[in-house]
């Protein structure tokens, strides 16, 4: 019975830490870039795109295809950085214990 009470207490504490971590993630912003910094994309902690910054040199209609590719690459870079940050925060909550394969938090 004592072990069960201890497990329940740990579960409650972990839930509180996870909620705190989720709030922290939601408040952060991550910026990814591509094209040697010519395109920057900013995501919030939920992964929603909030801003795109494009070097004026890429506004040339002849460079439109490259610009489109760089926006996609910058989004992928920002998402990768966000996933890494979320993983770091989750390890803090779980004491370094990795999540089961395929289980991602908070997305």
Swiss-Prot record:
Coiled-coil region(s): none
Pfam families reported in the protein's UniProt record: YbaB_DNA_bd
Top-rank lineage group of the source organism: Bacteria
Gene Ontology MF, one: DNA binding
UniProt protein name: Nucleoid-associated protein GDI3467/Gdia_2910
Locations listed in the record: Cytoplasm, Nucleoid
Native source species: Gluconacetobacter diazotrophicus (strain ATCC 49037 / DSM 5601 / CCUG 37298 / CIP 103539 / LMG 7603 / PAl5)
GO CC term, one of those recorded: bacterial nucleoid
Keywords: Cytoplasm, DNA-binding
Family from the record: Belongs to the YbaB/EbfC family.
InterPro entries: YbaB-like_sf, YbaB/EbfC
PANTHER family in UniProt: NUCLEOID-ASSOCIATED PROTEIN YBAB
Function (record text): Binds to DNA and alters its conformation. May be involved in regulation of gene expression, nucleoid organization and DNA protection.
Signal peptide: none
Subunit: Homodimer.
Main location: cytoplasm
């Amino acid at each position: 019975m004592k072990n069960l009470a201890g497990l329940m207490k740990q579960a409650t504490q972990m839930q509180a830490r996870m909620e705190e971590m989720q709030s922290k993630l939601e408040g952060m912003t991550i910026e990814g870039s591509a094209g040697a910094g010519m395109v920057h994309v900013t995501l919030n902690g939920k992964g929603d795109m909030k801003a795109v910054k494009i070097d004026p040199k890429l506004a040339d209609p002849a460079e439109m295809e490259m610009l489109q590719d760089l926006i996609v690459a910058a989004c992928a870079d920002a998402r990768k950085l966000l996933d890494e940050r979320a993983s770091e925060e989750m390890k803090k909550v779980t004491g370094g214990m990795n999540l089961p394969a395929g289980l991602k938090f908070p997305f």
